[in-house]
Structure formats: C-alpha cells, structure tokens
C-alpha cells in the first residue's frame, strides 16, 4: 500500500511519503507563518480534493489563474502564462490539471517563495516538468526531488517571454516574474505576495511576516525599490483573487515603496 505524502493544513506544504505525519512543520514554526490555536494539523491530497474544486479565471489575454474553492491553507492561486506555471497550489485534481494544460502546456513551474511550495512535486510529476526555486531558500524545501532545480544570482530567463527576478524582502530568495508580453506587450509583474496588492488596487505593500504583522526595514525596502525600478511592467497580478492592477502598475508600486519608507521615518 503506498504511503501518504502528508500536507500541513495551515500552510499547505506537502512532505515526503511516510507512515505517520511529521512531528512539525518548520515553515509554520518560522515567524513568517504560524501554528494555529488547534496545534499542528495534517491532511492528505485526497482529503484536500474532497469537497473542493478548481476555480479558473482569465485575468488578461494569455494569463489564466487557477485557485481552490473553498479555499485551503494560505489560499493563494497559481498563474499560467505561455508555458510557465507561476506559484503553486496544493489542490491537484483532474480539472485543475486540465486547466493548466489547456492554457498552453507547461515547460516550467517557478515559485515566488516557500509559502507556496505546496504540492510542487506532485504538480511537476503530473505535468512532467521542472520546478525552479531560488537557492537562497533551499532550507525551506520540505520535499526534495530531482525535478526541483535551484537557480542562483539575481535574474533568470525562462523561455522567450519570462524573466525571474530575485526581489528578496519576505524571503531572501523571494522572486517575482516579469512576463514581457503581458499587458498588451507593456509588461506584467507576477508578484506573489512579495508585492502585496492593497484593497483599492492603487497601492501595494510589503512585509517580512504577514500573519504576525512584522514590517520590513527601510534598508530592505530601498533595495527592493531599486530592483523594481529596473523592471518594465504595466500590470501587476498578486497571489490572491482580486489582487490585480491593470494599469500604471510600476508607478503605483514605486509610489507605495516611497509611502512605506515615509511611514517608517515618522
């Protein structure tokens, strides 16, 4: 009988197959996540899929989002763009996989930071592809696999249309993706939650820890702003439903960094 690869209920990270659940989830024990009042809890992919379904929406021409309803764990979505699967969700059912493949097939999965590693190995096996993670976050890989490839440095081209950029902030290896053909060839920033789109979609914010509300220091915001200033993009798409900026995205992100710095200096 095959062993279950247990999944953390709080963060959605999947661990290697085992007879019993792990004793702890290091990702949730880190101050950028949390262990809930009920303590460490575990589930399986089959249980995640029971009573849940894939939510699929086109965000702009050539960009499709796939999420989970009802939500699970952190609740992020994955974005599919011209052969790239950006970020990952835990749910892997036939409809979710079909939606990803229908969006053009996948040549690589790239993930912004460890909170969204989720069931990346299962997805990579299902899609017969590789997973690209920044080497600065290697300690947070809870399920090692030959399909997981680490990249180093500040930028990595993925095909003709995408570039991974190490932005840092939330995690040392925190990565954003620039899709050159997005926003009618003006460029699109796939931001995860390293750049968190605010409720009015006119501003964004940045955090070291979202659940524990720990801000980033001014020196890190200044460094991130310098990186963002070098990028070309018009639209921004974040990790969660509704976190989409259709126009003037770069100006809004830079203005938000300035506002953040001003608040820290008061």
Q: What spans do the regions from the language model cover?
A:
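Short, ordered loop/turn segments at secondary-structure junctions
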Residues: 114, 136, 241
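N-terminal juxtadomain amphipathic helix
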Residues: 3-71
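Active-site metal-binding motif and surrounding structural segment of the metallo-beta-lactamase
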Residues: 93-133, 234
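Short beta-strand micro-motifs in enzyme catalytic cores
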Residues: 4, 62-64, 75-79, 173-175
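Pre-active-site segment of Zn-dependent metallo-hydrolases
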Residues: 65-108, 143-147, 153
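Short amphipathic alpha-helical segments
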Residues: 98, 121-124, 145, 202-203, ...
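Metallo-beta-lactamase
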Residues: 2-23, 30-33, 47-61, 83-92, 121-173, 214-229, ...
């Amino acid at each position: 009988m095959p062993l279950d690869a247990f999944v953390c209920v709080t963060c959605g990270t999947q661990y290697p197959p085992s007879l019993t659940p792990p004793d702890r989830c290091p990702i949730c024990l880190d101050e950028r996540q949390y262990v809930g009042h009920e303590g460490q809890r575990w589930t399986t992919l089959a249980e995640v899929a029971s009573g849940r379904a894939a939510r699929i929406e086109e965000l702009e021409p050539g960009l499709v989002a796939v999420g989970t309803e009802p939500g699970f764990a952190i609740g992020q979505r994955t974005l599919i763009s011209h052969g790239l699967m950006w970020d990952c969700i835990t749910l892997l059912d036939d409809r979710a996989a079909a939606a990803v493949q229908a969006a053009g097939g996948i040549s690589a999965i790239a993930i912004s930071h460890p909170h969204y590693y989720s069931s990346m190995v299962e997805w990579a096996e299902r899609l017969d592809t590789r997973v690209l993670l920044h080497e600065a976050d290697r300690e947070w890989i809870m399920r090692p696999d030959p399909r997981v490839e680490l990249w180093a440095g500040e930028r990595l081209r993925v095909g003709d249309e995408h570039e991974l950029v190490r932005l840092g902030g939330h995690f040392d290896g925190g990565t954003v993706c620039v899709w050159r053909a997005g926003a009618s060839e003006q460029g699109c920033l796939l931001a995860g939650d390293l750049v968190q789109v605010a409720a009015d979609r006119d501003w964004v914010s940045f955090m070291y820890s979202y659940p524990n509300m720990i801000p980033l220091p001014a020196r890190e915001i200044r460094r991130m702003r310098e990186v963002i200033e070098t990028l070309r993009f018009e639209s921004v798409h974040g990790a969660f439903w509704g976190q989409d900026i259709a126009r003037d995205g770069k100006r809004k992100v830079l203005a938000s960094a300035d506002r953040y710095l001003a608040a820290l200096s008061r």
